[in-house]
Amino acid sequence: MVNKVKRRVSCFPKATYYKPREIPLCCLEIANISIEELEAIRLCDLLQIEQNEAADRMGISRKTFWSDLQRARQKVADALVNGKAIEISGGEYINTGECRVNFLCKECDHMWEPKFDQNRPTNCPSCGSSLIFRLGGDGRGKRFVENDYCCPKEKGSSRNTSEGSKKKLQ
């Protein structure tokens, strides 16, 4: 297997999950977009940077950038047209340090910001647990799974009586 060149990524999304409204996540297919694919979309489509410059910023060839961009656009289009959830995660990238990323340990609630030249941590520096999650911005974007199930009708979930549901029923 050929080693994939790690792309330089300078910004991370504030939210890492998007899904169609009113459909439980457990009932949806998920389109996974890697961090570097999102960076390609951000540079080319959002910031409208020419592909040559965008490829240089990511430290890859123009052909590789084009492949990443096309793959990402195809995944987004598939999710939007076919009603899939979009998860932004994973990939082989290097954080250039321009955006801050925090991690949270689910075991001990320790929150920390790794050094910019560090790869994604695999364990909590406080307790050593591998149950760590990246926080986007103010904590939004974490996958919402309560008690290992996601459908509101299962196991008498208390989410049926959430404030949003109450407003909808009235």
Swiss-Prot record:
One Pfam family it belongs to: DUF134
Family matches, as SUPFAM superfamilies: Sigma3 and sigma4 domains of RNA polymerase sigma factors
Entries under InterPro entries matching the protein: RNA_pol_sigma_r3/r4-like, UPF0251, WH-like_DNA-bd_sf
Cited PANTHER family: PTHR37478, UPF0251 PROTEIN TK0562
Family indicated by similarity: Belongs to the UPF0251 family.
Listed name of the protein: UPF0251 protein MA_1017
Organism in which the protein naturally occurs: Methanosarcina acetivorans (strain ATCC 35395 / DSM 2834 / JCM 12185 / C2A)
